[in-house]
Curated annotation (Swiss-Prot):
Keywords: Hydrolase, Serine esterase. Serine hydrolase involved in the detoxification of formaldehyde. Hydrolyzes S-formylglutathione to glutathione and formate. One of its GO terms (biological process) is formaldehyde catabolic process. Its EC number is 3.1.2.12. It catalyses: S-formylglutathione + H2O = formate + glutathione + H(+). Belongs to the esterase D family. The gene is fghA. One of its GO terms (molecular function) is carboxylic ester hydrolase activity. The active site is at residues 150, 226, 258. This is S-formylglutathione hydrolase. GO terms for cellular component: cytosol. Transmembrane segments: none annotated. It is an enzyme of class 3 (hydrolase).
Length: 279
């Protein structure tokens, strides 16, 4: 695995550095771009890490510029990493619809044509990118949390429940909560994973919550006026958490929709939540 990368940009932000970087990914076989916010504390030693996984159509840039994370990350001394949501470029399979292909990797490793050669976002986010950043930036490998929005919330929850020993905290904003029973999920799983329903289950946070849960507390925020509630299916995850007696908090936020205005509004709560658990 190559650990080389190039700097695209670095900007001062709340006393820290918001950087954008590019590297050649072995997982996807393409160049990949990612962003890291390093708080001022990173000048003095390793800092805890919060992975932020973005939603459909997003790149690394959307949350970096719209989620309002930097101010709170600086205050609580935590780094935030913003990966891209899929491989991109010529020769990479795509689809005319917004919710499949480039910008819609769904945080799975595709096994089906034409997606399998490049769409390995599970491996990229959980193995390749961590190795690169922990070997090149002042980040504490033993203090990792993960969060995300929409498709990224789905990714954060499934990854945390699969690797609970690695991610000491988890939260989500309006996650796609039951993808194997939603049009945001069935279409993508069929395309990327084929008929392997066991693989579908491994990437469904409601099913994972029923079967294994998470050893710590979980924080979920969901806008009650979200225009995609029927696709997100938050009630399925809420019921699974209740049936399991999963420690945590599931908040329906009155009047909030699915936008980054919603994410901004509760970003401070989420970063504080992770900072308290990552120490």
């Amino acid at each position: 695995m190559t650990l080389a990368y190039e700097t695209v940009s670095e900007n001062r932000s709340f006393g820290g550095i918001q950087g954008v970087y590019r590297h050649q990914s072995q997982a996807t076989g393409t160049p990949m771009t990612f962003a890291i916010y390093l708080p001022p504390d990173a000048r003095h030693g390793k800092v805890p890490v919060l992975w932020y996984l973005s939603g459909l159509t997003c790149t690394h840039e959307n949350a970096m510029t719209k989620a309002g994370a930097q101010e709170w990350a600086a205050e609580y001394g935590i780094a935030v990493i913003f990966p891209d949501t899929s491989p991109r470029g010529e020769g990479v399979a795509n689809d005319e619809t917004y919710d499949l292909g480039q910008g819609a990797g769904f945080y799975v490793d595709a096994t089906e044509a034409p997606w399998a050669p490049h769409f390995r976002m599970w491996h990229y986010v959980t193995h390749e990118l961590p190795e690169l950043v922990f070997n090149n930036f002042p980040l504490d490998r033993e203090a990792q949390g993960i969060t995300g929005h929409s498709m990224g919330g789905h990714g954060a929850l499934t990854i945390a429940m699969t690797f609970p020993e690695r991610y000491r905290s988890v939260s989500a904003f309006a996650p796609i909560a039951h993808p194997s029973e939603s049009d945001w999920g069935r279409k993508q799983f069929a395309a990327y994973l084929g008929d392997d329903k066991a693989a579908w289950k491994r990437h469904d946070s409601t099913i994972l919550m029923r079967e294994k849960g998470y050893p710590g507390e979980v924080l979920i925020d969901q806008g009650a006026s979200d225009q995609f509630l029927d696709l997100l299916k938050p009630e399925a995850l809420a019921h699974a958490m209740a049936e399991r007696r999963q420690p945590g908090t599931f908040r329906m936020q009155q009047g909030y929709d699915h936008s980054y205005f919603f994410v901004q509004s509760f970003m401070a709560d989420h970063i504080r939540w992770h900072a308290e658990r990552l120490g």
